[in-house]
Amino acid sequence: MAFRENVLEILEEITETDEVVQNTNIKLFDEGLLDSMATVQLLIEIEERLDITVPVSEFDRDEWATPEMIITQLEALK
């Protein structure tokens, strides 16, 4: 599975909706799909499944607002 699809799969599992796959520009926090607990879960899943460590200091809610933005941020950390 390609990197992009892996990230979207993780997001779909955490948000419990395929809306994140259908609309990769959806505002995850504004729509209530991600909150602080789900964000922690997301970072753990990214580290476990993609072997990418995201330092908490690197997490900026504005830069991680949409699935598309998350993919871009993670590609930069690979």
Curated annotation (Swiss-Prot):
GO terms for biological process: cell wall organization; lipoteichoic acid biosynthetic process. Keywords: Cell wall biogenesis/degradation, Cytoplasm, Phosphopantetheine, Phosphoprotein. The modification O-(pantetheine 4'-phosphoryl)serine is found at S36. It holds the Pfam family PP-binding. Residues 1-78 form the Carrier domain. It is found in: Cytoplasm. 4'-phosphopantetheine is transferred from CoA to a specific serine of apo-DCP. Its main location: cytoplasm. The keyword Phosphoprotein applies. InterPro entries: ACP-like_sf, DltC, PP-bd_ACP. It comes from the Bacteria. PROSITE patterns: CARRIER. One of its GO terms (cellular component) is cytoplasm. One of its GO terms (molecular function) is D-alanyl carrier activity. Pathway: Cell wall biogenesis; lipoteichoic acid biosynthesis. The keyword Transmembrane helix does not apply. NCBIfam families: dltC, PRK05087.1. Belongs to the DltC family. Carrier protein involved in the D-alanylation of lipoteichoic acid (LTA). The loading of thioester-linked D-alanine onto DltC is catalyzed by D-alanine--D-alanyl carrier protein ligase DltA. The DltC-carried D-alanyl group is further transferred to cell membrane phosphatidylglycerol (PG) by forming an ester bond, probably catalyzed by DltD. D-alanylation of LTA plays an important role in modulating the properties of the cell wall in Gram-positive bacteria, influencing the net charge of the cell wall. This is D-alanyl carrier protein. It comes from Listeria monocytogenes serotype 4a (strain HCC23). The gene is dltC.
